[in-house]
A protein has these predicted regions:
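…primarily DNA-binding HTH/wHTH and HhH modules…
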Residues: 213-229
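Short helix-to-turn junction characteristic of helix-turn-helix DNA-binding domains
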Residues: 85, 139-143, 190-194
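Short hydrophobic/aromatic patch on the recognition helix
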Residues: 31, 163, 167, 211-212, ...
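Aromatic/histidine-rich interaction motifs
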Residues: 66-84, 93
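Alpha-helical residues within the helix-turn-helix
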Residues: 154, 165, 169, 202-203, ...
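N-terminal regulatory/effector-sensing and dimerization cores
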Residues: 1-71
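Terminal helix-turn-helix DNA-binding modules in bacterial transcription factors
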Residues: 146-150, 169-213, 229
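Short, Lys/Arg-enriched, Trp-marked, Pro/Gly-tolerant hinge/linker segments that flank
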Residues: 68, 91-156, 169-181
């Protein structure tokens, strides 16, 4: 785990990246960018054949983006700026061709582009309550588990009503929404590792691949097949 004095953007030019903080996990498929504000302890994960680019923002620009971890769709212009700021070899050599004022302008345009983009529903919030943590651990280890919330509650000594309230109050979503987010996160990793759609659907708890495709498309914005290509 690491922590920076400046906020930073992590761009997935290829493959799937993940950014883990105390708030949860940001899932970063290709052509998305994750924002981590200054002061957040975090670590990155890479899955498949990845191309990770990192751009730090000064405090003057960081104030213009959310104060919490977030994931954004990357426009064509934002993508070109990210690649320019990091260079073809993913270092800062290309950026040396620009003076400081030009680099500042590029970063400002990048932030403007993020303002125009909507936050993506690709964050898996981390529970704080011990009971939710126990359920989360079980589902992390077995994302295909279709056990109901009531059955999971009996295993840890909590009612389904109590757990539903905790999911809503702590994580801002229902249990089924959270589990779907978790499954899509695992699906993105499996797709990045080269598995086909049917295998991924079954491995992540969908008996019917068409239902998996619909859930995946709703969250990621493209079908699993198109995402793989």
């Amino acid at each position: 785990m690491q922590c920076h004095a400046r906020g930073h953007l992590v761009y997935a030019g290829r493959g799937v990246l993940s950014v883990h903080t105390e708030r949860g996990t940001s899932i970063v498929p290709a052509n998305r960018v994750a924002w981590t504000p200054a002061g957040f302890t975090h670590c990155h994960g890479a899955h498949g054949n990845t191309d990770m680019r990192v751009v730090f923002l000064p405090a003057s620009l960081a104030r213009l983006v959310p104060g919490h971890p977030a994931v954004f769709m990357v426009s064509g212009l934002a993508r070109e700026i990210l690649l320019t700021l990091t260079g073809p070899r993913n270092d800062d050599r290309a950026a040396r061709d620009y003076d400081r004022a030009a680099l500042a302008r590029l970063r400002r345009v990048l932030v403007d582009e993020l303002h125009e983009a909507h936050e993506q529903p690709l964050r898996l919030p981390a529970p704080r309550d011990d009971r939710l943590q126990a359920i989360a651990q079980m589902l992390y280890e077995s994302p295909a588990d279709n056990t109901s919330l009531a059955e999971l509650g009996r295993a840890i000594g909590a009612s389904a009503r109590t757990l539903s309230r905790l999911f809503h109050n702590e994580l801002g979503m229902t249990f089924y929404e959270w589990r779907t987010q978790l499954r899509i996160y695992h699906a993105l990793i499996l797709l990045a590792d080269g598995h086909d759609t049917t295998h991924v659907a079954h491995a992540c708890g969908w008996a019917n691949p068409s239902h998996f495709i619909a859930a995946f498309t709703k969250l990621v914005g493209t079908t699993p097949g198109r995402h793989r290509t």
